């Protein structure tokens, strides 16, 4: 038996579908958008909505992405209301993400990776252990340099 807490249905072919969602209608942009520079910091734990946001920023060239390749895919992901199944022989509980999200992004061909930052920052285990946030430091350096160019 499948257990879910979301409005997910199954059609006659065995495919699951999302029944309703309040934001499936046309989204109208605000009349006063932010016009400054946008910097998005990413790392290997950038999944789900944050990876989707990074994909849109990169595809639409709306900001500079700084950091490490995202853990989530460029084209989308499988997530949403998790379906729980208890395997009959072992009794092991498994959770399956039934919803496949496709992002409205520029096609990069046969691309199977996460979002690659515009400025790639190399992290190492020492930085992580010492809590040395090299991604933040790189982003702040870029922002500082960009501001110097503006005020020269």
What are these regions (language model features)?
Residues 1-152:
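C-terminal "post-core" interaction segments
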């Amino acid at each position: 038996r499948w257990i879910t807490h979301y409005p997910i249905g199954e059609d006659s072919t065995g495919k699951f579908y999302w029944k309703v969602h309040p934001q499936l209608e046309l989204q109208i942009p605000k009349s006063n958008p932010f016009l400054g520079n946008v910097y998005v910091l990413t790392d290997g734990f950038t999944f789900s909505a944050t990876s989707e946001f990074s994909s849109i920023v990169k595809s639409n060239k709306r900001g500079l992405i700084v950091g490490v390749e995202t853990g989530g895919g460029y084209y989308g992901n499988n997530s949403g209301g998790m379906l729980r199944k208890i395997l009959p022989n072992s009794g092991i509980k498994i959770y399956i993400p039934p919803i496949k999200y496709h992002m409205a992004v520029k096609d990069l061909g046969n691309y199977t990776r996460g979002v690659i930052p515009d400025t790639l920052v190399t992290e190492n285990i020492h930085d992580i252990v010492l809590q040395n946030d090299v991604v933040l430091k790189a982003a702040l350096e870029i922002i500082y340099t960009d501001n110097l160019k503006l005020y020269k």
